[in-house]
């Protein structure tokens, strides 16, 4: 991500800037595919595919950094505005089908729309507060890492708690994982060729974020395989009983 305007970049980075831009574009492709896939799966399975709090945090981030504190780069603006547009569809299907997943908690089920609204507003205030504290350029990066961590943990917890794979798929997992993974080479390019303004990328916290993302999101694919195998075994056992 452009923590400092590209106009301040050294000549050696400008020579490889197209590679960093390609990574950003691939990120947009991955996440756009994920959003479209989530909308389709939500309608097909009549559920939602991303845990409630991470979904609201991610949507709030896109509202803040696509509309309120937009990026300097024209390409980054386009990527995030496009992502926000598709994410509106994800939010709509989540609000529409979420009640079906909360029959065990009637109080939550009855007030889900207000819970979504309050959660988005709360996360927007958090993103804006961090921007006021660190400055928008640095805050958008750190808050994006925080969103990713919440998405990774929330996805694992949701899959474990539900015990079924409705609302998700290998394609949804891979598109999300790939969309975030391709930003790591971009960060490496910035650190290697534009180190003066990207020293923070060697900080323990940044390295921890990257490591925990790889562990958690990689684990999701394994857990999804296990849950699907369990579903198949359960279905086969039920069929044998009927015979």
Swiss-Prot record:
One GO term describing the cellular component: membrane
| Location(s) in or outside the cell | Membrane
Membrane protein topology class: Multi-pass membrane protein
The name under which this protein is listed is Terpene cyclase dpmpB
State the UniProt keywords alphabetically.
Lyase, Membrane, Transmembrane, Transmembrane helix
Q: What is its EC number?
A: 4.2.3.-
Q: Cite the PANTHER family for this sequence.
A: PTHR42038, TERPENE CYCLASE AUSL
Q: Where are the transmembrane segments?
A: 13-33, 51-71, 78-98, 112-132, 141-161, 169-189, 207-227
Enzyme superclass (EC):
lyase
Q: What GO MF terms are annotated? A: lyase activity
The biological pathway it contributes to is: Secondary metabolite biosynthesis; terpenoid biosynthesis
In the record, biological process GO terms are: terpenoid biosynthetic process
Superkingdom as given in the UniProt entry: Eukaryota
What role does it serve in industrial or biotechnological applications? Diterpenoid pyrones display various biological activities and FDDP C shows anti-cancer and anti-HIV activities. FDDP C also shows inhibitory activity of 42-mer-amyloid beta aggregation that is involved in the pathogenesis of Alzheimer's disease.
- Is Lyase among this UniProt entry's keywords? yes
Q: Which family is this protein grouped under? A: Belongs to the paxB family.
């Amino acid at each position: 991500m452009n923590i400092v305007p590209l106009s301040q970049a050294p000549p050696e980075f400008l020579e490889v800037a197209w590679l960093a831009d390609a990574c950003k574009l691939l990120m947009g492709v991955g996440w756009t595919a994920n959003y479209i896939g989530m909308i389709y799966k939500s309608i097909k399975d009549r559920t939602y595919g991303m845990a409630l709090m991470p979904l609201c945090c991610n949507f709030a981030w896109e509202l803040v950094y696509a509309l309120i504190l937009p990026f300097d780069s024209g390409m980054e603006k386009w990527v995030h505005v496009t992502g926000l547009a598709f994410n509106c569809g994800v939010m709509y299907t989540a609000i529409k089908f979420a009640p079906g997943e909360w029959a065990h908690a009637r109080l939550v089920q009855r007030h889900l729309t207000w819970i979504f609204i309050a959660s988005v507003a709360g996360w927007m205030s958090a993103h804006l507060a961090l921007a006021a504290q660190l400055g928008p350029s640095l805050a958008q990066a750190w808050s994006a890492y925080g969103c990713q961590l919440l998405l990774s943990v929330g996805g694992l917890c949701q899959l474990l708690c539900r015990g079924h794979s409705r609302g998700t798929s290998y394609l949804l997992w891979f598109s999300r994982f790939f969309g975030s993974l391709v930003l790591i080479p971009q960060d490496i390019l910035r650190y290697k060729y534009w180190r003066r303004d990207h020293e923070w990328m060697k900080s323990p916290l940044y390295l921890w974020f990257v490591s925990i993302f790889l562990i958690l999101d990689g684990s999701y694919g394994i857990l999804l395989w296990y849950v699907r195998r369990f579903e198949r075994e359960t279905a086969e056992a039920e069929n044998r009983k009927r015979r």
